Regions:
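Generic N-terminal leader/processing signal
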Residues: 10-11, 35, 42, 76, ...
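Interhelical loop and helix-boundary elements at the membrane-water interface
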Residues: 14-29, 149, 156-160, 164
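Single conserved hydrophobic/aromatic residue that forms the stacking wall/gate
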Residues: 1-14
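Hydrophobic transmembrane alpha-helices
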Residues: 53-171
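Active-site pocket-lining segments that scaffold enzyme catalytic pockets across diverse folds
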Residues: 21-45
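Membrane-helix exit/interface motif
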Residues: 13-17, 39-54, 81-84
Length: 171
């Protein structure tokens, strides 16, 4: 019973409903996100619905094992980074510079983690559907990270100059 209660507490603690100042999303972004999920849901559902192409032995292939490892790393980066960002939220709406963990290297490690998760899915399924989801995710998150990175630099004079937007030491 304690495990279930802890799971419920975690779900409530991490819920978007709990955020003090949730940012408003433009309608166009919401519509594009909806369309993105419809298209990718169709491609991946169609691919995974014809699962007869995968045998149980497939799970011992190098690409599946590598994909699982990448997914674990990506999920850890994503969740830990989101928790750091959530801890910075204040009731006053004041912005703070995120520090520590992957924030030492990039402004948006949560986006990096999500990209790694979908890269892992593409590697695990070794499919065009998985690859397309990874590419769509990158096409969405990389420009957002670059724009957000520029915003951080304009908002904070003390923002770390050597920190990249999304990929450590690269972009």
């Amino acid at each position: 019973h304690n495990g279930r209660r802890r799971q419920r507490q975690m779900c409530i603690r991490d819920s978007p409903l709990r955020q003090n100042n949730p940012a408003k999303m433009p309608l166009l972004i919401a519509i594009l996100a909806f369309l993105f999920n419809i298209v990718n849901g169709y491609f991946n559902g169609t691919h995974l619905g014809s699962i007869q192409g995968y045998s149980i032995e497939f799970m011992s292939n190098w690409n599946f094992i590598l994909g699982v490892c990448l997914f674990i790393v990506g999920a850890y980066i994503n969740i830990k980074s989101d928790n750091i960002l959530l801890s910075l939220r204040s009731k006053s709406g004041e912005y703070k510079i995120p520090e520590g963990f992957m924030f030492r290297y990039v402004s948006f490690p949560n986006y990096l983690g999500e990209i790694l998760e979908w890269m892992a899915f593409a590697v695990m399924t070794w499919s065009l559907a998985g690859l397309s989801f990874m590419i769509w995710t990158m096409a969405n998150l990389v420009p957002r990270a670059i724009k957000g990175h520029q915003w951080y630099h304009s908002k904070f004079e003390s923002y770390p100059k050597d920190r990249k937007a999304i990929f450590p030491f690269i972009i």
